[in-house]
Curated annotation (Swiss-Prot):
Keyword Amino-acid biosynthesis tagged: yes
GO cellular component annotations of the record: cytosol
Protein known as: Bifunctional protein FolD
UniProt key word Acetylation: no
Family annotation (InterPro entries): Aminoacid_DH-like_N_sf (IPR046346), NAD(P)-bd_dom_sf (IPR036291), THF_DH/CycHdrlase (IPR000672), THF_DH/CycHdrlase_cat_dom (IPR020630), THF_DH/CycHdrlase_NAD-bd_dom (IPR020631)
Biological pathway: One-carbon metabolism; tetrahydrofolate interconversion
Record family assignment: Belongs to the tetrahydrofolate dehydrogenase/cyclohydrolase family.
Domain of life, source organism: Bacteria
Originating gene: folD
Subunit structure: Homodimer.
Amino acid sequence: MTASLLSGKPLAKLIQQQAQTEAKVLAEEGTCPTLAVVVATEDSSTHWYVRSIERAAEAAGINCRIIDVGHDATEQVLIAVLKDLSAELSVNGIILQTPLPPGVRTQELVKYIAPEKDIDGANPLSLGLLAVGERAFAPATARAVVEILDHFEIPVAGRNVVVVGRSTVVGKPLSLLLLQKDATTTVCHSKSGALGTYTKTADVVVVAAGRTGLLTGADVSEHSVVIDVGTNVLSDGSLTGDVDEASVRPVAAALTPVPGGVGSVTTALLLLHTAEAAREQSRATSAPVLTR
C-alpha cells in the first residue's frame, strides 16, 4: 500500500480564482484590495517567500506592498509601522513576517495589527474570537489544513484527530477549527512522550512542529490521513516537511506533499482573506481598530 498524495495545488488555484473574482468586483466598485507585508530580516528564504506572495497577489489583482524596515529594526520602529498601516485606509490586510530581529517580541507586536486587517490571525484578539466561535480571520495555515480536509472530503466529525504542535500560528488555532467541526482533537507537544502512542490510533494526523522527520512510518497506521505542515530548509536549499515521507508513505492512507501541499493553499488563503477584508471594510462593518 502506498499513500495517496493530497496535492494542495488544485485547491490553491480554486481559492486564488475566488480571490481574483472578488478583487475584480471590488476594483469595479472603486476599491483596490491592498496587502501590506512587513519584513525585518535578511533571511533569503523569507524574502523568497514574500516575493512569492507578491507575485501571487499581482496575478489575483491584489496590490501587495512590501515594507522592509531592515534587519536591525527596533520594536518601537515596528510598532510605529504597524500602527500606521492599521490606520491607513488604503491598506486592507497586514502580515508581520517572521523571523524578527533579536530581542523583538512577536507576541507584543501583533497586538498592534488592527483586527479587521489581521488577515493571518496573529493578533491575540483574533484567536480569542476564534475560541468563542465569533467571526475572525483564522491563521491562514490553520485554515489551509481544514480546507484541504474539506476539499478531499475527509470527514473529521466524531473522528480522532491528532495535532502535533501547539503554536499560536498553527496548532492552537487549528485545534479550535477542528473542534468547531466536531472532531475529537488531541494536541501533542514536546512533553507528550512517545508520539506514536497518540498518532497510531488517529484517523487524521496533522504535524506542525518544525522538526524534520518527526513523524515516521512507525507512528501511523494504514487508515491514517497525514497532513504535513512543516517547512524546513535543508543545507542544500531543498524544502522538506516534518514527516519522514519515505517511511510514512508506504503505510498511511494519504499524505500531503512538501512542497506542494499545505503551503500553496496558505498563500492563496492570504489573498482571499485580503479580498474579504477589503469587502468588509468597504461596507464599514468591520471591528474597531485595536488601540493601546
